[in-house]
Design a protein with these regions (language model features):
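Solvent-exposed, polar/charged alpha-helical surfaces in well-ordered, non-transmembrane soluble domains
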Residues: 64-71, 75, 112, 116, ...
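N-terminal pre-catalytic segment of deacetylase/amide-hydrolase enzymes
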Residues: 3-99
Length: 174
């Protein structure tokens, strides 16, 4: 158990070092970008899906790791970008490094696990909702989604209706 905790913490540190590296390189990746945004500190978007749903390892994060990541971001001095401000300032140079937090799909585990933490800590985010599974087993209800929308820290975005795996969809179906 102790080894798991050490590995988990180490993975969080490595993830956030990568995040810091991305900040240092994001404006310099192309000549065109560096021409226009060389003084831009930039915005990095971090996306999450499931919380404490260990049976889905590719899209899950344990809450203790999520909280560690949020604390590291805060301790590094990065601000979380309010999505409404992000939209208004999209094409403007940024004078500070910021994080745009996004949550995909509207899984119930987000509502039960991460939402209380984000609400308590007033961390803004966008929840991209797939509309077809709303209210089904494992997904949030419309009332829960409306609660987040009313919170003034959670913004609702449209993900897709059915969340098809596009590689498997024919051109005609697309």
């Amino acid at each position: 158990m102790i080894i798991k905790k050490i590995l988990s913490f180490t993975a969080s540190i490595i993830s956030l070092l990568i995040l810091q590296f991305l900040f240092l390189t994001n404006s310099n990746s192309e000549d065109n970008n560096s021409k226009y945004y060389s003084n831009d500190n930039g915005v990095l978007s971090i996306m999450y899906h499931r919380f404490n749903e260990n049976k889905y390892p590719s899209t899950n994060i344990r809450m203790e790791v999520f909280i560690q990541q949020m604390n590291i971001i805060k301790n590094l001095g990065y601000d979380f970008y309010d999505p409404k401000l992000f939209l208004n300032e999209f094409n403007k140079s940024k004078n500070k490094k910021k994080i745009l937090l996004t949550i995909d799909d509207g899984f119930k585990s987000f509502y039960n696990e991460a939402w209380p933490y984000l609400k308590k800590n007033k961390i803004p985010f966008i929840l991209f909702v797939s509309t077809e599974p709303v209210g089904k087993n494992g997904y949030m209800t419309w009332d829960e989604i409306k609660e987040i929308e009313k919170s003034k820290i959670g913004y609702i975005g449209h993900h897709s209706h059915t969340h098809e795996y596009l590689i498997d969809v024919t051109e005609k179906e697309f």
